[in-house]
């Protein structure tokens, strides 16, 4: 399990690791066909919406200062894992994140992602 935790935590925060992708095609490969997300706002986002947003985000340079910590990994089913962690954005906003990852024959795919704002 330690190896899987290391592999998956290196990919988080998802969609913000240039080494794993910056183009729509790369993000399509990274996400399951039925991927969906619940944002920190509580809104539900479709795969299409997320892909459109990522395409816009990576069209211009950006400088996010994000820190991830407190990673945990739990096996949900054969080749399916829940990864949870804390994300600190620009030293101000703290969210708890959860991503469901599925191991495929040649890579990892994201089935689901959720962010929840931590209130003081």
Residue ranges of model-derived segments:
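A beta-strand edge to alpha-helix "cap/lid" segment located at domain peripheries
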Residues: 2-29, 34-120
């Amino acid at each position: 399990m330690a190896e899987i935790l290391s592999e998956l935590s290196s990919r988080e925060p998802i969609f913000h690791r240039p080494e794993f992708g910056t183009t729509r095609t790369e993000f399509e490969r990274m996400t399951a066909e039925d991927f969906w997300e619940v944002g920190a706002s509580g809104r539900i986002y479709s795969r299409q919406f997320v892909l459109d947003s990522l395409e816009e985000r990576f069209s211009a340079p950006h400088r996010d200062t994000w820190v991830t910590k407190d990673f945990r990994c739990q096996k949900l089913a054969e080749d399916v894992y829940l990864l949870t962690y804390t994300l600190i954005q620009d030293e101000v906003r703290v969210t708890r994140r959860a991503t469901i990852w599925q191991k495929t024959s040649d890579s990892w795919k994201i089935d689901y992602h959720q962010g929840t704002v931590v209130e003081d």
